[in-house]
């Protein structure tokens, strides 16, 4: 069975392109609130689960031991734009355990933020691992390892104690089985595990509400949510979906993008978790899907919905800034 068309790209009065996908909204008790497409097919959540990957850093006491602030905790969950503040914060996290960028095993790439990339190129510099959008997460892994008295070298390997703790946290929160059959390698070299959308949404419902989690894990989840709500610019960057939407909605929503058209979110006040996947891996489709679900289910007042509207139906502009069309939720999201 094919997944339904969930987002259409309109140009003028016609549909120019269409994206198929699947999505689930689950409550903290595991009940399906709404679903479309195949929500039981395992997908790689990629960066959408970075907040879950940061749980051991908090609940182990490492964050307190190293006196990590809210901005640093937020960066540990980020797919950041490589702005100066992102790079400086990741560097400061490493310095707390006597390390530098040479300890990072995520690889280097040009900053996701155009402004940051241009700034580097302007002075003839090349990007380092600190500019990798995952450097905050990796700095968090290194901080966790050092605080636990572990050698951080090789921390990206599946059998390293850091990744064993991370996998255990994800499995606990989502109640998904993670094993060698579901494991692959992330773009930043750590393990990634294929998990059904149903389990991802359930996990984010529990992450948002704390329901069903051990008290220490629930407190860690709440601390991560609060850190990101207070520092939305750290989770992504200017003009990017997660930063802009969480700036609008504050602690009422937690959203996190992942590569290849995956998106997860939580509505903590409502005890709901959301997970979507665009079949073709299109980030624009996943963003529109999540925005449509937030708008439909969030219970926001008209003022907030008006501010969210540009993300529910994003305008398509040409190179002169002329509006030529829009993305629109379709099918089960229309």
Question: Which sequence ranges carry the predicted segments?
Answer:
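Residue-level preference for non-acidic, small/hydrophobic
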Residues: 50-54, 200, 271
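Active-site SXXK
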Residues: 45-63
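Active-site-adjacent helix/loop patches that line small-molecule binding or acyl-intermediate pockets
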Residues: 1, 69-180
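Short glycine-rich loop/turn motifs
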Residues: 18-23, 139, 167, 260-263
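Beta-lactamase-like hydrolase cores
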Residues: 1-40
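Bacterial peptidoglycan biogenesis and beta-lactam-recognition machinery
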Residues: 59-66, 98-102, 148-154, 160-167, ...
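Structured C-terminal helix/loop/strand segments within mature extracytoplasmic catalytic/sensor domains
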Residues: 205-334
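A short glycine/serine-rich beta->alpha loop
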Residues: 36-44, 76-80, 123-132, 184-191, ...
